[in-house]
């Protein structure tokens, strides 16, 4: 996270014009030394403490974050929401605080020119995020037709063929698995499967489904 303040990259790095993303980056800077200590990691309530630290929105934390963000503002090329990936591809900047889909886009764009970009996650912490569709209670109310239309739309974009089209266009992996239909898995394997014969498959199913009494899953 300290990269955003590194003078070596003065005006050669961009940050997100987003309260959530930039505030978290600052919290990451402020807490990374403590989080990486064995004493912190070996606590019985590690997850609760981690969440408490990174999601701290006390007046003092916000005030401290504001001062750090002012320094970041002086060091970065810009705060952006969409132009950062183009600036990275063109070489205008050398690093960009990106969402994963923008990272995929940037890497694919320069790959054809023989240039390799890397996507990295800070060792101490990062934020977990997702985009989703919501049916607003205030918007639908008791209108059955509106509810049916909203549900039909969600069903439509959740079809495996449309999920693949969306993933191809936006560069993000969907949470939709497709059930018995393997279209989505086949696409992911085709696009992102390892080409290294020495690679090892690692089963992450435990992270996405309940295992007995273990509730530590998404």
Describe the residue ranges of each PLM region.
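Extracytoplasmic ligand-binding site segments that recognize negatively charged/polar headgroups
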Residues: 1-83, 87-89
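Extracytoplasmic/periplasmic substrate-binding proteins
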Residues: 74-142
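Sec/Tat-exported extracytoplasmic proteins
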Residues: 8, 17, 30-34, 72-76, ...
């Amino acid at each position: 996270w300290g990269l955003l303040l590194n003078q070596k990259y003065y005006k050669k790095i961009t940050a997100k014009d987003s309260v959530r993303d930039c505030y978290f980056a600052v919290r990451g800077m402020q807490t990374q030394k403590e989080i990486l200590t064995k004493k912190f990691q070996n606590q019985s309530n590690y997850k609760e403490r981690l969440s408490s630290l990174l999601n701290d929105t006390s007046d003092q934390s916000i005030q401290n974050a504001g001062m750090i963000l002012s320094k970041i503002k002086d060091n970065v090329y810009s705060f952006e929401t969409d132009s950062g990936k183009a600036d990275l591809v063109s070489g205008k900047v050398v690093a960009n605080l990106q969402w994963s889909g923008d990272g995929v886009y940037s890497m694919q764009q320069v790959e054809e020119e023989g240039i390799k970009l890397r996507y990295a996650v800070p060792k101490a912490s990062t934020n977990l995020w997702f985009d989703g569709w919501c049916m607003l209670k205030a918007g639908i109310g008791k209108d059955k037709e509106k509810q049916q239309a909203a549900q039909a739309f969600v069903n439509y974009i959740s079809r495996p063929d449309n999920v693949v089209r969306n993933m191809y266009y936006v560069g993000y992996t969907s949470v939709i698995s497709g059930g018995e239909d393997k279209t989505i898995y086949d696409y992911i394997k085709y696009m992102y499967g390892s080409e290294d014969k020495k690679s090892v498959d690692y089963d992450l199913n435990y992270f996405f489904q309940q295992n007995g009494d273990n509730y530590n899953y998404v």
